[in-house]
Amino acid sequence: SAIQYSNGLWGQYVGKSLFGLTYRSGYRQEPADQLNTSLSIEQQLPFIQGLSIKGVINYDPYRVKKKKYLTPIPVYTLDASQTPYQYMEGFQGPEKPNLEQSFEESVSMTYQGMINYSRTFGKHTVTGLGVIEARERNVWNMSAKRLNYNINIDEINAGSSDPADISNGGTSWKERQVGYAFRLGYNYDNRYMAEVSGRYDGHYYFAPGKRFGFFPAFSLGWNLREESFMKDLIWMDKLKLRLSYGESGNLAGSSYQYM
């Protein structure tokens, strides 16, 4: 099959024209605006050595406009059984132009508050961390679609007035989650280490009364390389043993499946 006949008509192969799909099929636009901002403040507390607090706020707005305009691509096959030859017309894609437009806007916010402690007493080092975090996301969107345009004007109000060719939609939703976390650590002479941590998280995915879960973890460590009986092993510069255990949650699935 010819890509293009001598009279300028587009050829096709099994009903498709790659050239026509590239240059005559319409367009798709998705311009988007996104801003990621973060503000943090940290302060050492002078009345307790090694104690500090920190606050973080993230503000992330996002906006996207989508517009998809599909136009018919006429393709032709040559019928050599007739005299003179006849060109048989077909279409790739819709037989009349279609237009689909949508708009979505979202705002994501994250709030964090932290208190941190770290201090060494001789050979003993004690650390502690407490965190509270809240996240929220608000989303709005709307869409409109028109089929079977009789005029080649790519605007919603220029589309068909037949109810079967019209569809509109829109929705909005909110996402929320909150978490509390802690970590306590102890280190003796960089040889013996212990750490206990945990999270208490809540997420909007789950049914009221079952949205929160506690996830603990602990670890023990032994830095053998710092022991006196290892000092002469110059060919080994690091050797540690560690035992740890932890639990974590799972956000598999999607929101409101409990309904």
Where are these regions (language model features)?
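Feature captures outer-membrane beta-barrel proteins of Gram-negative bacteria and organelles
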Residues: 185, 214-222
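Transmembrane beta-strands of outer-membrane beta-barrel pores
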Residues: 57-65, 132-138, 198-204, 224-226, ...
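Short coil turns and loop connectors of transmembrane beta-barrels in diderm outer membranes
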Residues: 47-49, 122-124, 136, 190, ...
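Outer-membrane beta-barrel transmembrane strands
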Residues: 15-68, 98-120, 127, 139-141, ...
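Short glycine/threonine-rich loop-to-helix capping motif typified by GTGT followed
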Residues: 208-212
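Surface-exposed loop/turn segments flanking beta-strands in extracellular/periplasmic regions
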Residues: 1-16, 72-95, 138-168, 257-259
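Outer-membrane beta-barrel signature, preferentially recognizing the C-terminal barrel domain
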Residues: 161-181, 247, 259
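Surface-exposed extracellular loop regions of Gram-negative outer-membrane beta-barrel proteins
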Residues: 237-259
